[in-house]
């Protein structure tokens, strides 16, 4: 598995500049289980970054709706979703190798064949490897909120990124975001509402209740006990 992760900023035309990371490298140490998973299961479930567009039917061995999850953490929710929806295919992207290893181990334990993972910057993957109009859903759950005002530009949800996601969604495809930081939720809502071609699926034109399809994470359960909120946003590509 190659480990070459760079996150770009965008120029005024939406082209990526290799400057600003939307994440911090927190590689940490691999457990023996994660190391074993990377060595043994990556050749089967891992996808190396390249500048060639993916052929999803060839990758998964069938024609099926594809969900892309960006930043899957340790992979527990992604594996649960792939297990619950065997009729769909899932591609997960995560920049931290311990998380990739943990996800591979869980996916192998569940015997999943409808999940593949990548360890690379998601923006570059979207630009170089994801065909236009190919995704049923893009999921972005609990991205780094970059709390400090001077770091807000590092937030991954910006207009050029949301436009890029829209180009990869099929008509009727959905971009689903979730955050536990209300100012970031407000930022997401402002960005998404400014883009022509997206429809907010919220009846109140802001946030949606957590859909049953998104598992509650342990982190989220702890937040609920402490009285912390979570905001889900779902926007459909309508043109």
From Swiss-Prot:
Name of the molecule in the record: tRNA (guanine-N(7)-)-methyltransferase
One Pfam family recorded for the sequence: Methyltransf_4
Keywords for this protein: Methyltransferase, S-adenosyl-L-methionine, Transferase, tRNA processing
EC number: 2.1.1.33
Region of interest (Interaction with RNA), ranges: 150-155
Positions that bind substrate: 148, 180, 217-220
Residues binding S-adenosyl-L-methionine: 69, 94, 121, 144
Reactions performed catalytically: guanosine(46) in tRNA + S-adenosyl-L-methionine = N(7)-methylguanosine(46) in tRNA + S-adenosyl-L-homocysteine
Pathway where it operates: tRNA modification; N(7)-methylguanine-tRNA biosynthesis
Quaternary context: Monomer.
Gene3D superfamilies for the chain: Vaccinia Virus protein VP39 (3.40.50.150)
